[in-house]
Amino acid sequence: MQPTSPAAPHRRLYTEEQRARRDATRWTLVQGILAPLQFLVFAISLGLVLWYLATGEGYAAATASILIKTFLLYTIMVTGAIWEKVVFGQYLFAPAFFWEDVFSFGVIALHTAYLWALFTGQPHGLQMGIALAAYATYVINAGQFLWKLRMARLDMEAAQ
């Protein structure tokens, strides 16, 4: 029989001070509004992009939706950096959200690559392919943040 090692102690997502700052700042509400709004725009845009790719129709609508999604992504990244500064004392790469921030830069890079493709007149298929790659990374990144939200809720329940 193998000896078992004790489980590593659970590292809480927020200290009490960080939780208090998180709960007190308006940037938490801003993120709470922007995140579902961005997801809604993503879902609509994904449908428009897929429609365009399937039918060849609706390029302008798909393009407009990708531009709106990209604007929201940039906005949530800036406001999220401000939120991290308020809560953790640094604009990005706070230990609690390090990997989410790293992956966010990949998401931003792909959205920016889409803008490059659009503004340099690359073929529409390439533009939409880049948009789909950006959207795939966005879904993974959103999942990372949803996981952290779940962890924070579990931490709160354990603290009560």
UniProtKB/Swiss-Prot annotation:
GO terms for biological process: light-independent bacteriochlorophyll biosynthetic process; photosynthesis, dark reaction. It is an enzyme of class 4 (lyase). Its EC number is 4.2.1.-. Transmembrane segments: none annotated. It holds the Pfam family BCHF. InterPro entries: BCHF (IPR009905). Pathway: Porphyrin-containing compound metabolism; bacteriochlorophyll biosynthesis (light-independent). GO terms for molecular function: hydro-lyase activity. NCBIfam families: BchF. This is 2-vinyl bacteriochlorophyllide hydratase. The gene is bchF.
